[in-house]
């Protein structure tokens, strides 16, 4: 991805999606996350960002902690995540 973007003259990619997918979430249905395991998602997102940087493309990981639990896409509707701070820290911010 990084090489292709660099060859096209792109120097910033609003990626990777670093959200931890929740059961039945829009991001999981759309295949837009690296999975449901926080540690695996962190490793994959870090590797993706490193690959971009190696080609001279800056990475901007997204979205916000908890968004992986959203049932609808933020492209289609506003989303409210009703998780406690402890729940976010325990799953989405490890």
Regions found by a protein language model. Give the residues of each.
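Glycoside hydrolase catalytic-domain context in secreted enzymes
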Residues: 1-94
